[in-house]
Amino acid sequence: NLLLSLLPALSLSSCRKFRSDPEKITMRPRIFLEGAAPIPILDEYDVRLVQLGTIANIMTEEPNDRMFALWFSFDRRSAMTLQKETVRNVGKRLHLVIGGEIVGVHPIEGGITDGVLPFVLSANMPEENAVYLYNELSTSLVHIRAEFESKKG
């Protein structure tokens, strides 16, 4: 009986969707292929997750000198696009563009088959700027997905 009395509350809470707040969408990441038409090969609607991390800076002998990178994970369809474009364009670079500015670069060394694309941020980007970029992107992507889902119906 207790379970039956809770069913209406459970069904209402599971139907509630996260609402998009357009004011929280401050960044729309777009990915362009170097030297190609100025049309993004992937955009903010393709991204499922972004993560922040560090990588070794190969330009210095100092082992503690790290550079920040963003790892983008894509949905299945977009991962297939990413694989196709990276297989075709070995030796070129992908640019992460936000607000008209290139903020990250990925040199294409081979096909990316796992749907995860890392972008190295500028070597002189301070930690607080990298964290700010990550936080704004994360928040924006949550609201972009909610916006997309609400328009999809």
What would you call each of these model-derived segments?
Residues N1-L3:
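N-terminal export leaders
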Residues L7-P8:
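Short glycine/proline-centered loop/turn elements that form peptide/ligand docking sites
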